[in-house]
């Protein structure tokens, strides 16, 4: 009987400690999530030249050069990538 009570107390202690750990992790992660949602994301066919990871899901940043243009003149926009 004493062993059963000890196991119940141990289980309660572990569960409470786990809740505290999860709460602390949520507090650490939430500023990054708030920053991302405050900044928003880049929509379809909008330029992503200066933020290549900022496209809204399911879009991704695709960049290319137009023929005859210098390599420094890159065009980027959010679009669906099909294939690779």
UniProtKB/Swiss-Prot annotation:
Disulfide bonds join 41-56, 48-61, 55-78, 63-76. It is found in: Secreted. Coiled coil: none annotated. Keywords: Calcium channel impairing toxin, Disulfide bond, Ion channel impairing toxin, Knottin, Neurotoxin, Secreted, Signal, Toxin, Voltage-gated calcium channel impairing toxin. GO terms for molecular function: calcium channel regulator activity; toxin activity. Residues 1-17 form the signal peptide. InterPro entries: Spider_toxin_CSTX_knottin. Antagonist of L-type calcium channels (Cav1/CACNA1). Causes paralysis in the posterior limbs and gradual decreases in movement and aggression during 24 hours at dose levels of 5 ug per mouse. The presence of a 'disulfide through disulfide knot' structurally defines this protein as a knottin. This is U7-ctenitoxin-Pn1a. It comes from Phoneutria nigriventer (Brazilian armed spider).
């Amino acid at each position: 009987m004493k062993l059963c009570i000890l196991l119940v107390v141990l289980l309660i202690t572990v569960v409470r400690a786990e809740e505290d750990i999860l709460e602390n992790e949520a507090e650490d992660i939430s500023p990054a999530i708030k920053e991302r949602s405050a900044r928003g994301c880049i929509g379809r066919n909008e330029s992503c030249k200066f933020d290549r990871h900022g496209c809204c899901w399911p879009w991704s940043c695709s960049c290319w050069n137009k023929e005859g243009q210098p390599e420094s003149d890159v065009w980027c926009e959010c679009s669906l990538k099909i294939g690779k």
